[in-house]
Amino acid sequence: MSALEAIKYSRGKLEVLDQLRLPHEHHYDEVSTSEEAFDCIKTMRVRGAPAIAIVAALAASVELHNGSCTATSPEEAIKYIDGRLDYLYESRPTAVDLGNAVKLLKKTVRDVKTEGLTDAEAKEAIIKAFIEASEEILAKDLKTNKSIGAFGAKWLQEQYKITDDSKITVITHCNTGSLATSGHGTALGIIRTLRDEGLLRHAYCTETRPYNQGSRLTAFELVHEGIPSTLITDSMAAALFRLRKAEENIAAVIVGADRVVRNGDTANKIGTYQLAVLAKHHGIKFMVAAPTTSIDVDTLTGDEIEIEQRKREELTQISGAVINADGSIDTSKSVRVAIADQRIGVWNPGFDVTPNEYIDAIVTEKGTVVKGEDGRFHFEDLMPERFQ
């Protein structure tokens, strides 16, 4: 596993890596309340659907562990916890992992057996169950990511019969690695596994405007891991596919997902849809890597997904560390500069939806799902319990 950690946790203490300071500075913020977690998620100091859910759950756990709940009965304790979870959910409603974590934790506290306990004992039992369930979300995520990496690499090997003489090149978008999860990553986890198994020739990552998760975070992870890699702007993908597909054996676009709905439509970072269209045009496989917790079987199509609108300043301004005259980077100094006329109108959706017709495979920790003869992704074959 990569030494990079977006989340450091021990019972009663949570630290979150401030990803806005990367790649030049490593700084962990202590997160001890739901309000601090909300701000951390909203300002994108932590991002990535799995990491968002983990931070929200663990922040509430830390808060409870440290005595924030003053309820005097189990009913009041559950009401308090519900309020904390509902508040945290609003920090990023697009991320289905967060919604699933909220549902799981609400069910957990309601399933606690309190018969024969005093009110004080029942309250403590509810809090203990909540904390343990939150910690299990963290532990399960790492195992999930490694399984996604293995299944994704296996599927690509089956498609291309990769050998030492025919290693593949892939492209990824946004950040889906250790910084977006508890470790290893989803889409970037597949790339790591390809590298570890000697199947990877090269990886390209997009800049991912306007928040630059690709240039700030994915490029940093790829370099940190020693994976042969190149950074491109979002607008260079078509030219890359046209000019270098054969030369570099570009085989796949591999992306993560904030939400995959029942028919396979996928919401992910803005710019994903255009990559899918380009990949289809150039005969390149398009893969989505996501845990089953990111699959929303209650939402039928991508048309129903709520798309978050981000601040205009993300397009018109940019911040960064100061580069000295000798080329060195001064991490103690950061400047914010205008890169557009501040009077211009701005449309800044945080996500887009890729229709299922452009997706070749959806890789989960339970296996890889491809479309059947009817052109549909049959998630019910993978997780029948969710369709009962």
From Swiss-Prot:
Report the record's Gene Ontology biological process terms: L-methionine salvage from methylthioadenosine
Q: What is its main location?
A: cytoplasm
Q: Record's InterPro entries? A: IF-2B-related, IF-M1Pi, IF_2B-like_C, Initiation_fac_2B_a/b/d, M1Pi_N, NagB/RpiA_transferase-like
Pfam family of this protein, just one? IF-2B
From what superkingdom does this record's organism come? Eukaryota
Q: Which residues does the entry assign to the active site, renumbered to this chain?
A: 258 (proton donor)
Pathway assignment reads:
Amino-acid biosynthesis; L-methionine biosynthesis via salvage pathway; L-methionine from S-methyl-5-thio-alpha-D-ribose 1-phosphate: step 1/6
UniProt site (Transition state stabilizer): 174
What is the catalytic activity of this protein?
Answer: 5-(methylsulfanyl)-alpha-D-ribose 1-phosphate = 5-(methylsulfanyl)-D-ribulose 1-phosphate
List cellular component terms (GO).
cytoplasm; nucleus
Q: Where in the cell is it found?
A: Cytoplasm; Nucleus
What does the UniProt keyword field contain? Amino-acid biosynthesis, Cytoplasm, Isomerase, Methionine biosynthesis, Nucleus
- Class of this enzyme: isomerase
The protein's job, in short, is: Catalyzes the interconversion of methylthioribose-1-phosphate (MTR-1-P) into methylthioribulose-1-phosphate (MTRu-1-P).
Similarity comment text for this entry: Belongs to the eIF-2B alpha/beta/delta subunits family. MtnA subfamily.
Q: NCBIfam families under this entry?
A: eIF-2B_rel, PRK05720.1, salvage_mtnA
Q: What is this protein called?
A: Methylthioribose-1-phosphate isomerase
What is the originating organism of this protein? Sordaria macrospora (strain ATCC MYA-333 / DSM 997 / K(L3346) / K-hell)
